[in-house]
Amino acid sequence: MRHPMTFALAAAMLAVLSGSALADKYEGTKKCSSCHKSQGESWKSTAHAKAMESLKPKVKAAAKTKAKLDPNKDYTKDKDCVGCHVDGFNKEGGYTIASPDKFLAAVGCESCHGPGSKYRGIHRK
């Protein structure tokens, strides 16, 4: 082989690119709830379903004050806060501040179970 380094780089690029194309996608609790109806209904009344709401100004003011946070500040774009209040923060196909997805703006199914797309094949059997 005349150019082993070129071959190695090409192989590495192919591995990276093919891996990203196959990455599992976060789909949001609404998608999960379309089949898992009772779980979805139960989840709606939990603090997890409203996790992103607590980052808004004047919401949960006492808790924010106790945590030495400004209760009047909007924390919905604060990367140090958002990660614990949404599904798949800054992960492939997950919630991002730059392009927020309302279906991922909560602590939903995928926070524990991982990206929903990986379950499609399992559920269709």
Task: Locate predicted features.
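Sequence context of c-type cytochrome heme-c attachment sites
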Residues: 19-105, 116-125
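N-terminal export/membrane-targeting signals
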Residues: 1-23
